[in-house]
Amino acid sequence: MTTFNLTIVSAENKIFEGAVKSVQATGIEGELGILAGHTPLLTAIKPGIVKFTYNDGIEEVIYVSGGFLEIQPNIVTVLADVAIRGSDLDQDRILAAKKKAEDNIVAKSGDLNHEMLTAKLSKELAKLRAYELTEKLVKNKR
């Protein structure tokens, strides 16, 4: 299968750059599956995971806090405020932050910041999904 170049950068550094055969991400209008030769596109992406597959079939997961995805026929670029490899996520920290976000939503249900609190919970759930998917991929390699 034909490969293309994928670059994932955060505000702090370049997280990944290399040849891949496919990329999956969540755009603002739904799921995106990207292969070499994809039609050019620029779209915002939601907080969640970017999953990509190397030419040998190995998959990797990166959590992104949202950002932009640019697709050219042989180059895909993800620009995110925060990007963390699934293998670098800490389950205990994620679960603690998720619990705190849930408690804040319950405690401040009538608060004007409810939308912001819900967005925080959504990000923690996306991190947890990235962590769990990475764990599953690691177990399948064994």
From Swiss-Prot:
It is found in: Cell inner membrane. SUPFAM superfamilies: Epsilon subunit of F1F0-ATP synthase C-terminal domain, Epsilon subunit of F1F0-ATP synthase N-terminal domain. Gene3D superfamilies: ATP synthase delta/epsilon subunit, C-terminal domain, F0F1 ATP synthase delta/epsilon subunit, N-terminal. CDD domains: F1-ATPase_delta (cd12152). GO terms for molecular function: ATP binding; proton-transporting ATP synthase activity, rotational mechanism. Keywords: ATP synthesis, Cell inner membrane, Cell membrane, CF(1), Hydrogen ion transport, Ion transport, Membrane, Transport. It is a peripheral membrane protein. It comes from the Bacteria. The keyword Cell membrane applies. GO terms for cellular component: plasma membrane; proton-transporting ATP synthase complex. InterPro entries: ATP_F1_dsu/esu_C_sf, ATP_synth_F1_dsu/esu, ATP_synth_F1_dsu/esu_N, ATPsynth_dsu/esu_N. Signal peptide: none annotated. The keyword Signal does not apply. HAMAP family: ATP_synth_epsil_bac. Belongs to the ATPase epsilon chain family. F-type ATPases have 2 components, CF(1) - the catalytic core - and CF(0) - the membrane proton channel. CF(1) has five subunits: alpha(3), beta(3), gamma(1), delta(1), epsilon(1). CF(0) has three main subunits: a, b and c. Produces ATP from ADP in the presence of a proton gradient across the membrane. This is ATP synthase epsilon chain. The lineage of its organism: Bacteria, Pseudomonadati, Pseudomonadota, Gammaproteobacteria, Pasteurellales. The gene is atpC.
